[in-house]
């Protein structure tokens, strides 16, 4: 629930798509008579709803998914994974929904240690939601940009080809490093663009499980 979820240029923000996917997964769990819970995080765990069964519990989760607003702007996936590991003692199926942009300066994921511990206890899958337009910068001249999480801002000359290429290379590197990490720990992952049919992405994820 960090501020980066608000980004969106294709008619729907990442927040909208994340909320819809979370709701679909919750409905599916209730239909299968499974318990369902939710953990909301930014750079800290914002709210934890313990797993339960029942329609009223489902509606409570859906309401929180739609209405919840974080108290801070950052992202710390490690915090969420550590909390999950400690809060749920029995093995469970868990879905991590995020843009997965939580990296070191070299682009490597910051959450490897927490992931390694979590997957030893739980069946974890990753659903990455992204906006394709976020991964490239159009040539539109001098632009003032602001990081939605850190609050830092700067003027950027988007006509600089080297800068645009470096930006795209950075995103590509982040994606490759995260994919290697998930393969290393046998974590199923699907990437869903905000302008794609997320149902197809979810079907692909479940077919591969």
Language-model segments: what does each one mean?
Residues 20, 24, 75-82, 176, ...:
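Short, contiguous clusters of charged residues that form electrostatic/catalytic patches at enzyme active sites
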Residues 83-90, 104-209:
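Von Willebrand factor type A / integrin I
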Residues 48-64, 180, 185, 207-208:
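Short, electropositive alpha-helical surface patch
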Residues 1-52, 93, 97-98, 105, ...:
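An amphipathic, basic-hydrophobic helix/alpha-beta surface used to engage anionic
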Residues 21, 57, 61, 80, ...:
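Internal, well-ordered alpha-helical segments in soluble enzyme and binding-protein domains
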Residues 5, 65-69, 186-189:
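Short amphipathic alpha-helical interaction patches enriched in hydrophobic/aromatic residues
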Residues 57-92, 104-106, 131-132:
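Von Willebrand factor
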